[in-house]
């Protein structure tokens, strides 16, 4: 008696099997390329490994740094803050005006944060304490500075501002 296979393999079945293997290989290659692209992108993106913090206080007519010399910023001769490391920065501070009765001119109390020649923030108040700041993406070479409409309007002893480079923190979901 002759043994008969239960199922004969047909050329169509063999062709379908090759197509499904080919499809699986293409899908795996695409996943590998996407993973490799993501890895390259994240490794090339400049990120801050550790934070960097600087605080300034106003003395007589100049800002002076009250913290140790940081690695992410530098002060320029004209009192501006030069960014040395690109990243996300938190700018914070408070500007306290002198009492209104000591003001000789009627100019409004205005404080502005500048990045190069662009205004990042403008604050105006009728001689009240002004909290300043925000979170900004800054790049190496940017210059940041605070500008007042009149230095005679500012209490030098209690006015300060600072900047913190925020480290990129990994989030686990």
Curated annotation (Swiss-Prot):
For side Extracellular, which residue ranges? 42-173
Topology within the bilayer: Single-pass type II membrane protein
Cellular compartments annotated: Cell membrane
Please give the biological process terms from Gene Ontology that the record holds: adaptive immune response; negative regulation of T-helper 17 cell lineage commitment; positive regulation of cell adhesion; positive regulation of inflammatory response; positive regulation of macrophage chemotaxis; positive regulation of monocyte chemotaxis; positive regulation of NF-kappaB transcription factor activity; regulation of dendritic cell chemotaxis
What is this protein called in UniProt? Tumor necrosis factor ligand superfamily member 18
Q: Please verify whether the record's keywords include Glycoprotein.
A: yes
Tell me the null mutant phenotype.
Reduced levels of pro-inflammatory macrophages in the peritoneal cavity following injection with thioglycollate broth to induce peritonitis and reduced AGTR1 levels in spleen macrophages.
Q: Say which family it is in.
A: Belongs to the tumor necrosis factor family.
Gene source species: Mus musculus
Tissue expression as described in the entry: Detected in immature and mature dendritic cells and in macrophages (at protein level). Detected in spleen, lung, heart, thymus, monocytes, macrophages, B-cells and dendritic cells.
Q: Which gene encodes it?
A: Tnfsf18
Q: Which residues are glycosylated?
A: 74
Q: How does it assemble?
A: Homotrimer. Homodimer.
Per its UniProt record, what Gene3D superfamilies does this chain match?
2.60.120.40
Per the UniProt entry, the signal peptide is none
Please classify the protein's predominant subcellular localization into one broad category.
membrane
List the induction conditions: Up-regulated by exposure to bacterial lipopolysaccharide (LPS).
The yes or no answer to whether the keyword Signal is present is: no
UniProtKB keywords: Adaptive immunity, Cell membrane, Cytokine, Disulfide bond, Glycoprotein, Immunity, Membrane, Signal-anchor, Transmembrane, Transmembrane helix
What are the residue boundaries of the THD domain, all occurrences included? 40-166
């Amino acid at each position: 008696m002759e043994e008969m296979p239960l199922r004969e393999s047909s050329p169509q079945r063999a062709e379908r099997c090759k197509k499904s293997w080919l499809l699986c290989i293409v899908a795996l290659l695409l996943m590998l390329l996407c993973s490799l692209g993501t890895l390259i992108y994240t490794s090339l993106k400049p990120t801050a490994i550790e934070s960097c913090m600087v605080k300034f206080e106003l003395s007589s007519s100049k800002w002076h740094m009250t913290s140790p010399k940081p690695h992410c910023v530098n002060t320029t001769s004209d009192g501006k803050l030069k960014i040395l490391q690109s990243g996300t920065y938190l700018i914070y501070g408070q500007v306290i005006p002198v009492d209104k009765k000591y003001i000789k001119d009627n100019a409004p109390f205005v404080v502005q944060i500048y990045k190069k020649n662009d205004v990042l923030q403008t604050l105006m108040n009728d001689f009240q304490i002004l909290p300043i700041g925000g979170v900004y993406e800054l790049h190496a070479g940017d210059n940041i500075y605070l500008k007042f409409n009149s230095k005679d309007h500012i209490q030098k002893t209690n006015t300060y501002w600072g900047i913190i480079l925020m480290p990129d923190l990994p989030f686990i979901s």
